[in-house]
Amino acid sequence: RHGLTAYNAEKRYQGQRDIPLCPAGRAQLRQADLWPETVYITPLCRTRQTAEVLFPGARLVEVKDLQEMCFGSFEGRNFIEMEHDPDYLAWVNANCESPCPDGETKAVFSERVCRAFAALVDRALADGEETLVILAHGGTQMAAMERYALPHADYYHWCAPNAGGYVLDAGDWAEQRVLHLLKTVQYTKEEAR
């Protein structure tokens, strides 16, 4: 997942707004302990900025369908600003499953992400790649992990902190379309100590 942005710090829905890392978010990142040739990112600058610090020198390839969910009219706002908004309250009361006004449903978003994610895993395995690195968004992680990760857990369980993620094993992917969780990772300077 990308590093901290001002919207993250203010608990605002970012969605597909192109919000950069905040100075504190950039300062807390540290270089990862692996050196992939290629890192898959989204067109949003916060993923590129994070990848440039974590994986310097890697070729960065944008995958549009890995972008965060489009939260429509909720983007740029936080809960406090919307606590009396009937559209927001209806969406929250529907477990965030209904469409966001001018945005996506969680189901449409998850399908988009999982299709793109699976295509990358399929291609990496077909090409004999040892490592596949994807640096995207919290929602992207949650959608892919809910669908493909073992042990199974619900969508919100998989919300990693900023600059956090998962290391997965694809040994059973070809036959079962599952990935086994090996460990979580956190690429901030505090976690390096």
What are these language model-derived features?
Residues T5, T140-Q141:
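Short active-site segment of divalent metal-dependent hydrolases/proteases
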Residues W35-D65, A90, E146, D169-R193:
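Conserved histidine-centered catalytic loops in small-molecule metabolism enzymes
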Residues P151-V178:
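Domain-level recognition of soluble alpha/beta enzyme cores
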Residues R1-A58:
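Active-site-proximal alpha-helix that buttresses catalytic centers in soluble enzyme cores
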Residues E37, G128-G138:
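Generic beta-sheet signal
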Residues L54-R112:
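Phosphate-handling substructures
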Residues I41-T42, E111, L135-A136:
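Short beta-strand scaffold positions
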Residues P20, A58-D65, H152-P161:
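Short hydrophobic/aromatic-enriched beta-strand-loop microsegments
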